[in-house]
């Protein structure tokens, strides 16, 4: 009987020890930064690898051209009235470089950690900066005291891990509080009510290089009939020797 009680007591002690160790691991995980918990490394220099919508991205489409964008009837007067010179004069030359469009603008990215819980994306096209903040709560939640809308808006991020071991994961980002801009350089609009959802994934290339795959979903109840989805790709570069920031322009 005493041996049985001793055995039971031993099992209980082992369970407490295991439970305590598990709780400690969970506590350590919850206190770790987003940088420490990253399942994939997105940092470095990346150049656009244009595999879709070449004719709409590499040159400015003609006025009135909005094929492949599910523009609503409300968008058509703006599309047909597009005047790049007027935009430039009004200081709106960055309208096609906002968060809903910037990843599709051909150019280079520089991705770094601004701090332990903020991933920073700089673009040489338009010299834009996106700050992806790993904040508590659901991505896309806008604070009650949100600042004025900006071209890059407010981006909340979180890591999404794959269930299988050693298979990495992806980054999910939701951006809101955007200043109204253009989905394409020729004046196809999106409104301040737009929300941009993105997934960032990595994929190997046959030559040993790495691709950054960005799936972008733009939702706008004002100027889009249905969500607009694009998938710009970027190839990793060895260094920043080709990094060449240029200002926004509405005329080229």
Language-model features and meaning:
Residues 2, 20-252:
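PEST-like low-complexity, intrinsically disordered acidic/proline/serine-rich tracts
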Residues 8-17:
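Bacterial N-terminal signal peptides
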């Amino acid at each position: 009987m005493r041996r049985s009680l001793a055995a039971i007591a031993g099992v209980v002690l082992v369970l407490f020890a295991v439970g305590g160790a598990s709780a400690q691991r969970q506590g350590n995980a919850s206190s770790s930064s987003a940088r420490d918990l990253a399942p994939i490394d997105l940092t470095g220099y990346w150049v656009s690898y244009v595999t879709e919508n070449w004719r709409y991205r590499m040159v400015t489409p003609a006025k009135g051209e909005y094929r492949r964008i599910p523009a609503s009837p409300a968008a058509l007067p703006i599309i047909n009235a597009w005047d790049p010179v007027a935009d430039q004069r009004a200081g709106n030359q960055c309208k096609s470089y906002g968060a809903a469009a910037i990843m599709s603008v051909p150019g280079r990215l520089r991705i770094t950690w601004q701090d332990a819980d903020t991933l920073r994306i700089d673009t040489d096209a338009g010299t834009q900066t996106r700050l992806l903040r790993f904040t508590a709560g659901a991505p896309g939640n806008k604070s009650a005291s949100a600042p004025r809308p900006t071209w890059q808006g407010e981006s909340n991020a979180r890591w999404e891990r794959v269930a299988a071991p050693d298979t990495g994961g992806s980054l999910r980002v939701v951006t809101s509080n955007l200043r109204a801009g253009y989905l394409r350089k020729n004046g196809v609009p999106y409104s301040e009510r737009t929300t941009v959802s993105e997934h960032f994934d990595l994929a190997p290339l046959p030559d040993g290089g790495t691709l950054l795959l960005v799936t972008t979903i733009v939702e706008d109840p004002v100027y889009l009939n249905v969500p607009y989805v694009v998938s710009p790709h970027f190839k990793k570069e060895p260094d920043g020797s080709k990094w060449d920031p240029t200002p926004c322009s509405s005329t080229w």
